[in-house]
Curated annotation (Swiss-Prot):
Subcellular location: Cytoplasm
Protein family per UniProt: Belongs to the TRAFAC class translation factor GTPase superfamily. Classic translation factor GTPase family. EF-G/EF-2 subfamily.
GO biological process: ribosome disassembly
Organism per entry: Chlamydia trachomatis serovar L2 (strain ATCC VR-902B / DSM 19102 / 434/Bu)
HAMAP family reported for this sequence: EF_G_EF_2_B (MF_00054_B)
Function of the protein: Catalyzes the GTP-dependent ribosomal translocation step during translation elongation. During this step, the ribosome changes from the pre-translocational (PRE) to the post-translocational (POST) state as the newly formed A-site-bound peptidyl-tRNA and P-site-bound deacylated tRNA move to the P and E sites, respectively. Catalyzes the coordinated movement of the two tRNA molecules, the mRNA and conformational changes in the ribosome.
Keywords assigned by UniProt, alphabetized: Cytoplasm, Elongation factor, GTP-binding, Nucleotide-binding, Protein biosynthesis
MF-aspect GO terms: GTP binding; GTPase activity; translation elongation factor activity
SMART domains: EFG_C, EFG_IV
Pfam families assigned: EFG_C, EFG_III, EFG_IV, GTP_EFTU, GTP_EFTU_D2
Name of the protein in question: Elongation factor G
Entry-linked Gene3D superfamilies: 3.30.230.10, 3.30.70.240, Elongation Factor G (Translational Gtpase), domain 3 (3.30.70.870), P-loop containing nucleotide triphosphate hydrolases (3.40.50.300), Translation factors (2.40.30.10)
The organism's place on the tree of life at top rank: Bacteria
């Protein structure tokens, strides 16, 4: 099918998101199978899933990178991004949600809402992504569809509305009643569930289905209060409402984020996947429904609103970089306005660099098809971009527009790394550079005192997998040290400094004079460096050098050498020498000045605090809470259901190394826990002194 056959209203850009192990990749595999993209179904537990194309993913049975693929269904073109459910890969979820128009949240019918489902749901709220839900694994022991719906309401605050009523559950799960069409769908075992037949609603479910349908209609009546005809029918003659009318109101409610319809099925047993595909097309938004996208015009500094039109100016967002052994560097983009053609010259407005597109590729996991152009609403990949990284805006050379960036959280864990042989030193540097371009939460730095290379990331699994990739993709063998906490430094009061850098040693001297004011920035806002220089006391051409020096100075703090965060620096005054001043002199002076100001601004050390959720049998609850308290944890809350208790707490990461092992021994292996970065907080004075001594 060529793209020309698809209007914008027939495109769906969707993500599939869930907690690890809810069956998300299996659901995507079935979608690919039924939509005719794969001729053989990939099974995750056999290591053959199409979307999990990296070797590490196939070995570990988890999804690490968001694979993008395109399928066709009911006359629509669906671009699907499969996202990882493990907390160490939150940036993958964050960046895919940023470019999606809608999402399918997959839940496990036994567990309902799990901790990672809450994280992903919060991220989707942040970007206002409309969602429908699929309660998967209805064939499992203990499956409870209505329990899962209830947990969505309680834990996520979702307006979850069942649109199915399951027929049987666990091994007796044979199908579902569609509350909209009022038909019972029975999946035929001889076709492995690929086909089904419609029958009458079984007698023992008729009353329950009538109640559920009425609740569904009443909820829909509140979605669009201007639609009086629909409200009237709901109140006076609900049986006269057509399926078409229900779908219209349902679509409006989903797109406006007022409702989250919930379907059920078992992807593994092929039940309910085609029904899910139908409603992806019927209810989730097209790029047109998501409306205009906001950006900033760089020439005027004003906010602009871009219509989703293929004739408009080009505006695209790079949301992922991949290094491919055959093609080289691939940049994934989403086009919000205009058309991008193969061979065209464009501007990376974030970096003010010109780029040229050498190839355009439509991706299916790791297979690819060449394309001549991508237009508004498309998600695709480009080859040939040299400077663009995640979050950069690509636009026409004469239309300087910047779109909202993708925020990357600060890494929380550090490891020292060195090549096993001296000959690998350069290869290691190349590998680290390529990997940090792909993943904004992976940072590479050098410890100034020891000269060691330090890699930082979101957790041990994150760094483990990157190390695996170095060995496999870049053929680099490296030794890594023990994981360490990634501490940060910040300041707690306002201060200033006046610094002169003067050198006279025969020949041309060096001269720079810089005055700074520094103040604490809002937590989580990062560092800001601004110039308030007026009247040319420092010439305009030297200001970027001062800023660069200040930024480099902030890379290592004054207490223990950890990077400074949340500091606002203003360059307020200075002077220069006609002959002796240079960019280098001002850069060195900027770095010295910011260090001097920080020493006077009561610096403190910050540590990453993790949100920890533990699910434990109730008889071990006391031990688990006692253990978290000993680790300087702050208990946020606990709840119980079916002899299991869930405890949530905030605990410093430094106290959590080896936690899984001790939790297993505390609870005889019956408890599970998840941990995700929450925020950075000041360390207690006694611990700060110990860190500084080290």
């Amino acid at each position: 099918m060529s793209d020309q056959e698809f209007g914008l209203d027939a495109i769906r850009n969707i993500g599939i998101m869930a907690h690890i192990d809810a069956g998300k990749t299996t659901t995507t595999e079935r979608i690919l199978f039924y939509a005719g993209r794969t001729h053989k179904i990939g099974e995750v537990h056999e290591g053959g899933a199409t979307m999990d194309w990296m070797e590490q993913e196939q070995e570990r049975g988890i999804t690490i990178t968001s694979a993008a693929t395109t399928v066709f269904w009911l006359g629509a073109k669906i671009n699907i991004i499969d996202t990882p459910g493990h907390v160490d890969f939150t940036i993958e979820v964050e960046r895919s949600l940023r470019v999606l128009d809608g999402a399918v949240a997959v839940f496990d019918a036994v567990s309902g809402v799990e901790p990672q489902s809450e994280t992903v749901w919060r991220q989707a709220n942040k970007y206002g992504v409309p969602r429908i839900a699929f309660v998967n694994k209805m064939d499992r022991m203990g499956a409870n569809y209505f329990g899962a719906v209830e947990s969505m309401r309680e834990k996520l605050g979702a307006n979850a509305i069942p649109v199915h009523c399951p027929i049987g559950s666990e091994s007796q799960f044979v199908g579902m009643v569609d509350l909209i069409s009022q038909k019972a769908l029975y999946f035929l075992e001889e076709t492995l569930g690929a086909k089904w037949e419609e029958r009458k609603i079984p007698e023992d479910l008729q009353e329950q289905c009538a109640t559920l349908r009425m609740q569904l209609l009443e909820e829909l009546a509140t979605v669009d209060e201007s639609n009086e005809a629909f409200m009237e029918k709901v109140l006076e003659n609900p049986d006269s409402i057509t399926e078409e009318e229900i779908h219209t109101v349902m679509r409006k409610g989903v797109i406006e984020g007022k409702i989250n319809p919930v379907l059920c099925g078992s992807a593994f047993k092929n039940k309910g996947v085609q029904q899910l595909l139908d409603v992806i097309v019927k209810w989730l938004p097209s790029p047109l429904d998501r409306g205009n996208v906001r950006g900033i015009n760089l020439k005027t500094g004003e906010e602009v609103s871009l219509k989703p039109s293929k004739d408009g100016p080009l505006a695209a967002l790079a949301f992922k970089i991949m290094t491919d052994p055959y093609v080289g560097r691939i940049t994934f983009i989403r086009i919000y306005s205009g058309t991008l053609k193969k061979g065209s010259a464009i501007l990376n407005s974030t970096k003010d660099k010109k780029e040229r597109i050498s190839r355009l590729l439509e991706m299916h996991a790791n297979e690819r098809t060449d394309r001549d152009e991508f237009t508004v609403g498309d998600i695709g990949a480009c080859v040939g971009l040299k400077f663009s990284v995640t979050g950069d805006t690509l636009c026409d050379e004469n239309q300087e527009i910047v779109l909202e960036r993708i925020e990357a959280p600060e890494p929380v864990i550090d490891m020292a790394i060195e090549p096993k042989s001296k000959g690998d030193r350069e290869k290691l540097a190349q590998a680290l550079s390529a990997l940090s371009e792909e993943d904004p939460t992976f940072r590479v730095s050098t410890n100034e005192e020891t000269g060691q290379t330090i890699i930082s990331g979101m957790g041990e699994l994150h760094l483990d997998i990157l190390r695996d990739r170095m060995i496999r993709e870049f053929r680099v063998e490296a030794n890594v040290g023990k994981p360490q906490v990634s501490y940060k430094e910040t300041i707690t009061k306002t201060s200033n400094s006046e610094t002169k850098y003067v050198k006279q040693s025969g020949g041309r001297g060096q001269y720079a004079h810089v005055c700074l004011e520094i103040e604490p920035n809002e937590p989580g806002k990062g560092n800001e460096v601004v110039s308030k220089i007026v009247g040319g006391v420092i010439p305009k051409e030297y200001i970027p050098a001062v800023i660069k020096g200040v930024e480099e100075g902030l890379n290592s703090g004054v207490l223990a050498g950890y990077g400074l965060v949340d500091v606002k620096v203003s360059i307020v005054f200075g002077s220069y020498h006609e002959v002796d001043s240079s960019e280098m002199a001002f850069k060195i002076c900027g770095s010295m000045a910011v260090k001097e100001a920080c020493r006077k601004a009561l610096p403190v050390i910050l540590e990453p605090i993790m949100k920890v959720t533990v699910i434990t049998p109730e008889d071990h609850l006391g031990d688990v809470i006692g253990d978290l308290n000993r680790r300087r944890g702050k208990i946020l809350g606990q709840e119980s259901s079916r002899n299991m208790a869930q405890v949530s707490a905030e605990v410093p990461l430094s106290e959590m190394f080896g936690y899984m092992t001790s939790l297993r021994s505390l609870t005889s292996g019956r408890a599970t826990s998840t941990m995700e970065p929450a925020f950075f907080a000041k360390v207690p004075q006694k611990i700060q002194e110990e860190i500084v001594k080290k």
